[in-house]
Amino acid sequence: MTTVGVSLFRRSPEKITMKIATFLGLSFLLIASYVLICEAQHPGFQELLILEENMRDPENSKERSCAKPRENCNRMNILCCRGECVCPTFGDCFCYGD
């Protein structure tokens, strides 16, 4: 009985490292899948918030449904109130300029 108990604790460091790496990799994949599923279920959520905010903003009373500087643009036909829509290589497009 003691040999069985002792052998359980005599695992090689390589096996332990592989198990930890596998656990971390699977955890990352699980979190990434949750993020992708959430984005797929709520597409354009941020753009809708911009439109709703602009509808209540007296500064944009003439130019409704437009994005202010540093807000996302060019998705779902959202144009910039002032300035131009800049799209970096990675990430979302945003309004630049005053």
From Swiss-Prot:
<feature type="disulfide bond">
    <location>
        <begin position="80"/>
        <end position="95"/>
    </location>
</feature>
<dbReference type="GO" id="GO:0090729">
    <property type="term" value="F:toxin activity"/>
</dbReference>
<dbReference type="GO" id="GO:0099106">
    <property type="term" value="F:ion channel regulator activity"/>
</dbReference>
<dbReference type="GO" id="GO:0005576">
    <property type="term" value="C:extracellular region"/>
</dbReference>
<keyword id="KW-0732">Signal</keyword>
<keyword id="KW-0800">Toxin</keyword>
<keyword id="KW-0964">Secreted</keyword>
<feature type="disulfide bond">
    <location>
        <begin position="66"/>
        <end position="81"/>
    </location>
</feature>
<feature type="propeptide">
    <location>
        <begin position="41"/>
        <end position="64"/>
    </location>
</feature>
<feature type="disulfide bond">
    <location>
        <begin position="73"/>
        <end position="85"/>
    </location>
</feature>
<keyword id="KW-0960">Knottin</keyword>
<comment type="similarity">
    <text>Belongs to the hainantoxin family. 17 subfamily.</text>
</comment>
<protein>
    <recommendedName>
        <fullName>Hainantoxin-XVII</fullName>
    </recommendedName>
</protein>
<feature type="signal peptide">
    <location>
        <begin position="1"/>
        <end position="40"/>
    </location>
</feature>
<keyword id="KW-0872">Ion channel impairing toxin</keyword>
<comment type="function">
    <text>Putative ion channel inhibitor.</text>
</comment>
<keyword id="KW-1015">Disulfide bond</keyword>
